[in-house]
Amino acid sequence: MQICASIAQFLAWVSFLVLLATVGSSSSSESLLNCQPLDHHLVNPSRLLGFLRAMSSVNDFITNDKLWVVSSITDVSPPIYVFLQCREDLSVSDCRHCFNESRLELERKCSGSGGRIHSDRCFLRFDDRDFSEEFVDPTFDKANCEETGTGFGEFWRFLDEALVNVTLKAVKNGGFGAASVIKTEAVYALAQCWQTLDENTCRECLVNARSSLRACDGHEARAFFTGCYLKYSTHKFFDDAAEHKPDADQRNFIRSSFFPHLSDRDVTRLAIAAISLSILTSLGAFISYRRVSRKRKAQVPSCVNFKYEMLEKATESFHDSMKLGQGGAGSVYKGILPDGRIVAVKKLFFNTREWADQFFNEVNLISGVQHKNLVRLLGCSIEGPKSLLVYEYVHNRSLDQILFMKNTVHILSWKQRFNIIIGISEGLEYLHRGSEVKIIHRDIKTSNILLDRNLSPKIADFGLIRSMGTDKTQTNTGIAGTLGYLAPEYLIKGQLTEKADVYAFGVLIIEIVTGKKNNAFTQGTSSVLYSVWEHFKANTLDRSIDPRLKGSFVEEEALKVLQIGLLCVQSSVELRPSMSEIVFMLQNKDSKFEYPKQPPFLSASVLMPDEETRV
């Protein structure tokens, strides 16, 4: 009863607060990368393993109560020290997402003794020495200014007011603050000090950062400093909860009056939760009605809804002239939305309602997965006669349409092929390790690799194929995927791990280098995989490289990719590298790796030739 009374009093205390439920639009994210150079004369495998261990431990320590982590691995030589600081207004999911993106960048580009990356949402640093006492380092402090001038005479006064307010607020509020000045023009500002800084050092860092931003001439700028982050913009880039976060005095009042046992972060969370509860309670009847009338819609709360009629019109009623292709989950159409945006609309087919429910549960899981080498899911429509998914539109064709076309006008250069291979490896590595939910693609192949205007690869259909039921285009094995790309343990025994994707990736990169498609039913010396293996044994691997390149390629890179491909297609799961190891091998010229020990697995030997190539 006493607890209930306290909660009631607390709700009454916060009821006067007026908060908007909308989230401000985010500006484009920027990042600043600084690296210690890689020692090309000494590649230490234990260094990579130590790095991966240290980063893995950081991910485990990110919680609702703590969005900053100090970690170290000291049983390796040299030791590895890691520090992560996320913005205090981020969710755990967003913090982990930023951490994993930053970690991948450091892993690819900063494999030397140390490196740091600063983005709008988090800061990540690693080094081989303890840097916990380093709060100021002008050599790494930088202000990124937008070039466009403001054109407003009073803007500077409003900007200075916002920067001063947010600095004072952050120092008083444990290192974080958000503020706005809305007059003839709006200015929004956000400040974050690292949690390892005391109040005086935080103030010093933000004052220096503020001085650097005053030299900028634009509507948006950010200061990436060693111990803090400061940003302003004329566009709102944080939500209302960040700006109305209780300061230290308010938290002390709440704690002393109602909950003396709670920590600062618990009080903040309780305040936000109480406000949210008040809003939800007032809208309860309306929400209940929506849930009853749109029960199916509620199954995918994180999926942005598109009206079926709008998508039907955008695709000209799914006319064949708008059809882009067909995958394992359904047909894909080009759509032009009323605002002029071009999207890709996938019209799904299901056998039963059970499969539909399972599928949309999975859509709910993957809707937040975002990476530059993954096709982005924009939303869905689930209330019309057909279930639809809406993806970003990738302007170029799929990789197979460019790579295997005999009379194609454009022959992919070696540089383009190598960049495509790097991008695919990074996208797969993110699915396996970088996203909050591990996703095994199951159907990596050239037709599921889309190319944008710059020929950068984007992986399509990730996370979806595993929810589909069996239909007439599939054999009765119950296995999802495409023959020729299926790993033996998955095809024969149904055992699925991320190494199944590694196998398919190996086939894919061999196809990219050779320019030849792997046919699941081609036996003996006619098989692309077998031919590359034989050339490897005979030390004539260069003869496997696509002759259309006419010698215009970096032989060392091409041979290395083929050897990595052979490592990936070995029958034994244990002998195949992980995608993290593959990314490291591809990114680092001097990386050493074992030679393949087993010939490639030729999956056609376990199936009859008259079966469909899709399972």
From Swiss-Prot:
Keywords: ATP-binding, Glycoprotein, Kinase, Membrane, Nucleotide-binding, Receptor, Repeat, Serine/threonine-protein kinase, Signal, Transferase, Transmembrane, Transmembrane helix. Pfam families: Pkinase, Stress-antifung. It is a single-pass membrane protein. Residues 288-615 are cytoplasmic. It is an enzyme of class 2 (transferase). Residues 29-131, 137-237 form the Gnk2-homologous domain. ATP binds at L324, G325, Q326, G327, G328, A329, G330, S331, V332, K346. This is Cysteine-rich receptor-like protein kinase 1. The gene is CRK1.
